[in-house]
Swiss-Prot record:
Keywords: Cell inner membrane, Cell membrane, Membrane, NAD, Quinone, Translocase, Transmembrane, Transmembrane helix, Transport, Ubiquinone. GO terms for cellular component: NADH dehydrogenase complex; plasma membrane. It is a multi-pass membrane protein. Gene3D superfamilies: 1.10.287.3510. This is NADH-quinone oxidoreductase subunit K. NDH-1 shuttles electrons from NADH, via FMN and iron-sulfur (Fe-S) centers, to quinones in the respiratory chain. The immediate electron acceptor for the enzyme in this species is believed to be ubiquinone. Couples the redox reaction to proton translocation (for every two electrons transferred, four hydrogen ions are translocated across the cytoplasmic membrane), and thus conserves the redox energy in a proton gradient. It comes from Bdellovibrio bacteriovorus (strain ATCC 15356 / DSM 50701 / NCIMB 9529 / HD100). It is found in: Cell inner membrane. The chain crosses the membrane at residues 11-31, 36-56, 67-87. Its main location: membrane. The gene is nuoK. Disulfide bonds: none annotated.
Amino acid sequence: MNTEFINNIGLTHYLVLAALLFVMGMAGVLLRRNVIVLLMSIELMLNSVNLTFVAFSKYLGLLDGHIMVFFVMTIAAAEAAVGLALAVSIFKRFNEVNIRFFEHLKG
């Protein structure tokens, strides 16, 4: 099996993939109104940023990008935990997880 193409993947390929993932996540945030899908879209956007950090880190030969990924992953885990806890408590209270439902709840 010829695996030479793996060695030819450059920085541009990683950045294009990260941009596509980010756009997909942004589309999910802008177009969907479900809280769970919204959180998953934000996680996808954060993972595309992680891919960019790792790609630049590999390209420049530094470990700074890899270290930054750990911080982003920590923040993403905390964001997911808090977001899911809020979604569960909102669902228990209102039996609804649609964002449009909560626009009238300004206090």
